[in-house]
């Protein structure tokens, strides 16, 4: 019997959606080097059935070239084929990243950061989402009942995310009705964004298989609880040491960290245009929303744009190792590559 498995070549666009083309499994090896063509006007797609004004029209094409290290294959369902996909680079002739490739943006930014500071950027994203069409009535926030009501979903999701190797750390109920949160372990550079992209798609797939829909929208209801995609990050030197903290300095932050925070606070309105890019994003942001109320920073302040997160350890070495910052504005309408 011919294997009917389809492998998806996927890429993250400007509105946080994963676009794709597919190839039969038998064609995969032949397509790995040069990928598949894609009309560049596709990058002007919104979440709705229209295109934003763009200079391309029907002209030009890029290649969506799969990144071998991002292979993800989830095979946990008896009644559905494996969920098999790769993340892609958008490339022009000669194997160079297209100027509008979101993955290329992040690669360039990380290279610039390392060139200027000599450091690597380490990050981890939190994923808040609502389970839509859950047939079980909502239980009180943060309770065991809330988790056990969706035990089949969380079991499948945990199994699938473990297969996806994204460093799953926590699965928990959240404050909103049918709201949950998943966190991934920190990773260096591109890997952090790739883990986030893969995690979201796997979570969506697990919900689909059970007749539900996982919504990462910043607000499902204008007056409801919001979903964020908070980014925890730190700076690492060539030896792997976390250099974000300097005990004894203000808030135990290193000079570089203080400068970085100052830059983020100063440019927060422009940063929000990239990290919270949709109209619905601004139903989530604001004072008393436990998201971002102000262009400010603070130690364990969940309404500041930048939250300083000291380590819970009392061991001096662990305190330095665990020290990190949290950018609280981002949501899932932005590509993790751009955040």
Q: Where are the language model's segments positioned?
A:
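ATP/Mg2+-dependent ligation/transfer catalytic cores
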Residues: 1-170, 195, 339
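Short, hydrophobic beta-strand segments
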Residues: 86-92, 180-187, 233
